[in-house]
């Protein structure tokens, strides 16, 4: 939905449309940022902000390295626009944890404030931010800026970080940080000849020890790996996965198991959830995921991102399902020679196993209430962000770009230890996002309550928990006009 109080960019800013939408990425720069940008810049171009100093603010995720990189790299952008366009810019960074960031952004945007000029949004928030007209629709911006007309690594990038509604051509975000689930593995354990011999003797199979081994690994055999390395008397467990009620921590691995096993979470076209989420396949996925707690350290039902980092870097687990974006925290100077990052296991019936894991990552979105100057800087910043030099520098600092040129380069796999797994999991059909619906927050809160109730033992019946979630989410979407059917009569009798 366009903002009725904000006409199409170019007219609303009072700047000639051709000037306003002229991209900052048409210089055709090459090389790496290590050599100063200014040595390769063309003569200064006419710009409506020439001679001015603009202060900008980015709102991002607290404690999340990729979020802060935009601001940490902003002096490079300042050099770029100072030499090319003749203006100065400085960036401040406001932040909030994942669980609080949406509310912080929404509270500000609802007042039409330009407190945060550019926001790093979680991907599922696109609908909630776009529908009220709080963020800028980017189709026209992209059309007029060749530097933003990138070839993305896969369709998954567009579907996850850019489009709302799903399946439409409306673009509201641009990828800031790409992210996929990866399995971090203790290379020092799986490459140990004594461990390999013991595993072979116990299970009559090779201990998976290479990227290719894990590429072909199914959940049944992965469970053997977890079991083998679960040695509480030695302070070692087989795995760490996320089970926490905070934000989406339990949801992401559980949805991944459901999808990979052949389950679905809703019908996006009709908004139908009851009868889809609460299926037998998804019930079995719930039961399997809970059963894996025996391979994890005590307290694993409270594990989120930070808790996994702690037990991993302390050497307490042999494997860990974690986001690729957390690579710099997971791989430290002390353990970097002992870690490999690989695709997580496949699920499903023998011979038909597959992996479809939850996407992570965040898009940039632009505040629709920015004044003319800040809107222009935001567009210039986006053009700069997707320059080849910037994307490569971002990767070198630990970020995950999403464009095909950067990710397809010969050097990319070797830049970070997780890059190969990240690319693998970004291939079509291997990862996907879940709802971009404006009711995302309410739906997530309800299911996190239900999922963790079962994982902690408060609720004993997996199918009953799924019925509770499905009925509640069906009501949420029916009340919002998204679902065509109201919850069935059965829903009147469900509870945790």
Task: Please place each PLM-identified region on the residue numbering.
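Short, solvent-exposed loop/beta-turn-alpha elements that line the ligand-binding surface or hinge
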Residues: 49-51, 140-153, 197-202, 206-214, ...
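Hinge/lid segment of periplasmic solute-binding proteins
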Residues: 46, 123-184, 250, 340-344, ...
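Long, aromatic- and glycine/proline-rich binding clefts that accommodate carbohydrate-like moieties
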Residues: 38-46, 50-53, 155, 161-164, ...
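Extracytoplasmic "Venus flytrap"/periplasmic binding protein-like
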Residues: 79, 83-156, 193, 311, ...
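Short, polar/charged alpha-helical segment
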Residues: 64-88, 447
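Glycine-centered hinge/linker elements that transmit conformational signals in sensory
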Residues: 221-230, 257, 261-302
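N-terminal secretory signal peptides
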Residues: 1-15, 42
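Extracytoplasmic/periplasmic substrate-recognition and gating elements
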Residues: 2, 54-60, 84-87, 165-169, ...
């Amino acid at each position: 939905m366009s903002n009725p109080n904000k006409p199409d960019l170019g007219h609303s800013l009072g700047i000639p449309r051709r000037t306003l939408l002229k991209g900052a990425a048409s210089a055709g720069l090459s090389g790496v940022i290590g050599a100063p940008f200014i040595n390769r810049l063309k003569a200064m171009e006419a710009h409506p902000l020439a001679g001015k100093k603009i202060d900008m603010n980015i709102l991002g995720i607290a404690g999340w390295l990729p979020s802060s990189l935009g601001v940490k790299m902003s002096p490079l952008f300042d050099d770029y626009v100072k030499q090319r366009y003749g203006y100065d810019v400085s960036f401040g960074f406001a932040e909030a944890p994942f669980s609080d960031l949406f509310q912080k952004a929404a509270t500000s945007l609802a007042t039409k404030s330009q407190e945060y000029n550019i926001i790093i949004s979680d991907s599922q928030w696109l609908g909630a931010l776009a529908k009220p007209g709080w963020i800028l629709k980017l189709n026209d911006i992209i059309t007029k800026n060749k530097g933003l007309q990138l070839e993305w690594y896969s369709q998954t990038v567009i579907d996850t970080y850019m489009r709302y509604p799903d399946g439409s051509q409306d673009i509201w975000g641009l990828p800031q940080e790409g992210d996929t689930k990866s399995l971090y593995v203790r290379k020092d354990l799986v490459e140990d000849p004594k461990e390999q011999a013991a595993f072979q003797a116990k299970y009559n199979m090779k201990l998976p020890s290479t990227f290719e081994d894990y590429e072909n690994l199914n959940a049944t055999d992965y469970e053997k790996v977890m079991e083998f390395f679960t040695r509480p008397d030695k302070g070692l467990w087989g795995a760490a996965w996320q089970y926490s009620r905070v934000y989406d921590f339990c949801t992401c691995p559980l949805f991944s198991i459901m999808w990979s096993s052949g389950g679905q979470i809703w019908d996006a076209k009709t908004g139908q959830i009851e009868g889809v989420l609460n299926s037998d396949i998804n019930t079995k996925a719930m039961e399997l995921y809970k059963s894996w707690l025996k391979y994890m350290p005590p307290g694993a039902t409270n594990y989120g991102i930070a808790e996994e980092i702690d037990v991993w870097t302390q050497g307490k687990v042999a494997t860990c399902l974690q986001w690729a974006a957390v690579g710099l925290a997971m791989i430290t100077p002390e353990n970097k020679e002992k870690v490999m990052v690989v695709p997580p296991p496949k699920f499903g019936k023998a011979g038909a196993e597959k992996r479809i894991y939850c996407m992570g990552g965040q898009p940039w979105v632009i505040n629709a209430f920015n004044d003319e100057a800040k809107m222009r800087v935001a567009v210039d910043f986006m053009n700069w962000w997707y320059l080849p030099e910037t994307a490569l520098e971002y990767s070198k600092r630990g970020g995950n770009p999403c464009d095909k040129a950067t990710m397809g380069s010969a050097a990319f796999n070797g830049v970070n230890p997780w890059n190969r797994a990240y690319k693998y999991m970004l291939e079509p059909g291997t990862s996907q996002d879940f709802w971009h619906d404006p009711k995302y927050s309410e739906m997530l809160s309800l299911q996190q309550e239900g999922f963790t109730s079962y994982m902690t033992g408060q609720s004993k019946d997996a199918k009953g928990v799924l019925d509770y979630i499905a009925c509640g989410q069906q009501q949420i979407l029916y009340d919002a006009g998204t679902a065509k059917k109201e919850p069935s009569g059965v829903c009147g009798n469900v509870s945790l």
